[in-house]
Structures are given as structure tokens and as C-alpha cells.
Amino acid sequence: MKNLLKAMILKSLIKSQKLAEKCDSVFSLKCQLNINMDLCNPNQKRVLFSYLDIRKYEPKNTVHANFQQAVQMLKCLIDMGYCVDICYLNDEITIKYVLNRNKEYDIILGHGDLYKQACKLECNKKALKILFVTENFPLVVEKKYAERAEYLKQRHPKLDFSCSPVRSGYFDEEIFTVSDYAVIMSSLYNIEPMKAYVKKTYQINSNIIFNKDFHFDKAARLNSIKEYKKNFLWFGSFGLVHKGVDILLDTFKELPDYKIAFYGLAPSEKSIFEEMKSSNTKDCGRINVQTEDFIEKVVNKHCFMIMPSCSEGMNTSVATCMAHGIIPIVTKETGFEPCKYIIELEDYKIETVIECINKVLSMSEEEILAMSEGACKYAQENFCLTHFDNSFRKIMKQIMHSADE
């Protein structure tokens, strides 16, 4: 019934703009138009910002760092004097409502279906098209996920993991071909395949969600290291196979003296976890980074987090854990530049992960403390929201200058 109603609405929207506007009041379309409109400036430039629906965003309950990004990107566009339409990137009804207006934009920024369709409209032929990339290149994602799926099949030929699909949907190859520039939240290694599709790429760091009650206390951290250094952490979201949870479950079966806690598993994928888990692996549900529980249960009781993902942009959960003193162990594809406070796995194989775990646990408590403090300072400096904001503003100015040449 829900899909039938949705299809009827979509069909009606194409025929009637007035009906579309009525739908806005009934269904609350995921967009906000004409932000920062200046009626005294007939030459004001217009931007379509295709990203997230931030109308009900509450800073104290940030579920993902990308909401903070969207707010600051919008603030930058306002400060640059643009009139902005900000819309959710993949909502079909919103897309029809916005694009049927045939509004001409000077800049189209973001990603998703709305971005791609708007870029292809004749009325936006002259618009500057800036792709904001938060994932790895889609062809690479498909290849890397296929490798992981095959590796899992080799180890568990009878396991049904169809409920854990490849993480995709916002990006495909075509979205790069319709873009002029790309602002990419990833490592230079991950950015390389994307360079051939656009005039120029710009690298930007991800931002963290930070718990304001946290401060790095050396004495307290050393006590945590002494008591909990054999406790490991996976901190993520949906995409169990994509993000290497299956590899960690099999790894810790071989390491019965160590423990690993999993935060953020998707409910739809927990059947796989239940089938593969062992006594030293625990599903801890989800947790709000900005709460006291996060400090008590996650920060104070873990020294290392492991993210053996097959493909990422620049993983925000890794950056967030670093900013709270947790040392990351990651694959190269997780999207970070080489750094002495980030431990990079040579590959994703179980024996490699085991070797790395044993190696880090051979470090002295003082060495772990120094690395924990270094990771904390590095992340707070390089992955803070202010750093993201400053970088985005600088990039936008560079793009405008390049476009004017």
C-alpha cells in the first residue's frame, strides 16, 4: 500500500506543480528552499545543495558526523552570499518536487540522485557542478567487496550473508562523469582513480563527533591500559562484511584470551553475527558519542579499535575514536593518510590481523600511553569540525577562482 501511494504521488507530481506544493505541507518534503535569499540583489547566485535533511538536526544528539558537515557547508554557502536550496539527496518525491520547478542554478553541490539528475538538466548546463565524495570510488568499492565476499565464502561456504550487501547507492560512475570538480573526503591513495573523471580533485578530512566531557588524563589512561589493553573495539555501522566484522569474528576465535566489543551493528545483519560469534565477542548495540556512557563503556575500557574495512571515504568512526585516545588499527582502504598514530594492516587476512594484534600487545604500557595521547592530539587537530570548516571554505574559494580562469 505504501509503495502504491508513493507511485501515485510521483506520477501526480510530474503533472502538477501545485499538487507538489500541497504535498509539501502534507508529507513534509525533505528540502528547504531560498535560504539566504536577497531580494535587493537581482544578480544573486543560486546553489542547489544535495546532501542531508538537516531541518530537525539537534547538535546534542548528533547521530553521524555528516550532519555537522552539512550544517557548516551550508553556513559557508550563506557567508559567500548564495541563495541556497538544500535538499535530501535520495528522496524520490523531493527530487521530483525540486527538479520540476526547472530552476536554474549557478552551482550544484553534493551527491546522490538529486545531484546527478540536476546536473543533467538542460537548464543547468552552465552550472558549476561540484561533487562532494564521502565514499571510495564505486568501481573500487565493488571490486573490494567482491574480494571480501569470496574470502568469507571460502571460510564459511554454507553461511548466508545476503542481508549484508555492498555499501553503495549514493555514488556510481556516472555521477563522476557529470561533475566538474570533486571535493573528496579520503586519502590520496583512494582519490587516485577519481582524478580522470573531473577537472580537479580537492582532498578534505572527515570530522569527528567529540564528547565535550572528555579530556585526556595520563594517569587515568595508564590505569585503563593496565586493566583493559586486551579489550579491543569495533565501532561502525551497517555493512558487516564490508567493514570487516566477519574477519574480526573469525580472528578472535583464534584469540580466546582477548575480547572485542562491537558497537553499531545494523539490526538487519545481526543474524550473521549471532551465527559467527564466540564467547569473547560481544554485540553492545549502539551508543551516543556525546553521552557519559560513551566515555565509561567505550573510551575508558578500550585501548585499540580495529576497522578492517574493504573500502571507505575517510572513516569518521575511526577519527572519532582517535580523538578520544583510542589507537586505530585499519586497512589502507579505510581512507587515512599514513600517520605514526594509525596502525595500518598489510592486508585483511585473518593471520595478518592476528599478527598485528600480538604485535601491539607486545608494546609496553608506556609506549601504548604515548601512542594513545598522540592519536588523541592528532585527531583533535586534524579532524575537528573547525578544520573541516576552514578546509571547505578554502576549497570553495579555489574552485571559484579556477572556474573564473
Predicted feature residues:
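A charged, aromatic-enriched C-terminal amphipathic alpha-helix characteristic of glycosyltransferases
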Residues: 218-220, 365-397
